[in-house]
Structures are given as structure tokens and as C-alpha cells.
Amino acid sequence: MKKITKLETERLFIFPISLEDADFVLAVHNTPKFIEFIGDRNLRTLEDAENYIKNRFLLHYEKHGFGNCLIVEKSTGKKIGAVGIFVRDGLDVPDIGFSFLPEFEGKGFGYEASAKLMETVFTDFGLEKISAITTNENIASQNLIEKLGLKYVKMIRLPDDDVDLRYYEK
């Protein structure tokens, strides 16, 4: 099976998230915007983050060859965000998601990383469609999703969730 190993853009390296990234996963999952717009994943310790990586990210990657990826700024070597393509219950089309540490938001990294990952899954994995979901309140994500060429389709609700989400597709 084909697997994403390393992607590169002008300013970024993009790698599958590994156990060595537990400190970053813990930090980004506990930012106020992540909790508000994506949800509280109850990651409170490094061990919680390691288990989350093992039980969610690594299993998804092994099954599909793609999943959640770490975004590293080339010029500094800093871990700045994550971008991923996910096969998710309740969605017929894999969806793209992204998150950043607050100090790296609004610099175009989300578009750069997401566009590269989308290009890769369309070309190398034969995906014909991609989707995205976000809340009504998350205007920044809506803007990025639309900039990536996805179009709003409808409001949806994922299984076992009580939040209405905007559903986009390309």
C-alpha cells in the first residue's frame, strides 16, 4: 500500500505524526481555538497524547496510507501545526482538517500545507473528492476551506455528536 512519508513545500515539511510528536499533539489539542472549534479530546498528559497518536493517528495511517501529518516550518525547524485527510464515520468522502499553534495562524501555512496534501491524495492515492467540515462560528476555517476550492453543500451532524457542521466538498 502506498503511504505518505514526507512532503515538502516552499516553506514547510509535512510528515505523518509519530509518537515523538506527543508533546506537540498535547499542546495543539489544548489551545483555546482547538477546544472551541474542534472539541476537547481530553488530552491532559504526555501519556494521553501518546495513546491518542497510537490509537487514532497511527491506526488510520496504517489502514489508509494517509492521515494526520505534522507541519514543520523549514526555516526554524519548529512544529507549527497539523493537517490531515481522514476517513470518518458519517462522511462518505474523506475530509481534510488542520490546526495550528496560535502564533502560526494567519501566515498562509494552512493553505500551503493543505493544498500540498490535497494534491498528493488526488494524484498518488486516486481520491476523486475531498470534503471538509467546520462549525458555523469558525470563519477562519471556512475561508481557508473555500480558498482551497471546496464548496459549501449542506449542514450535517456526525454520528454521536450534537453539533451542526458546515459540510464542503471538492
Regions flagged by a language model, labelled:
Residues 1-37, 68-170:
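Acyl-donor (CoA/ACP) binding surface of acyl/acetyltransferases
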Residues 33-55:
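Conserved GNAT-fold acetyl-CoA-binding loop/helix
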Residues 57-70:
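A short helix-loop-beta-strand connector motif used in the catalytic cores of GNAT acetyltransferases and
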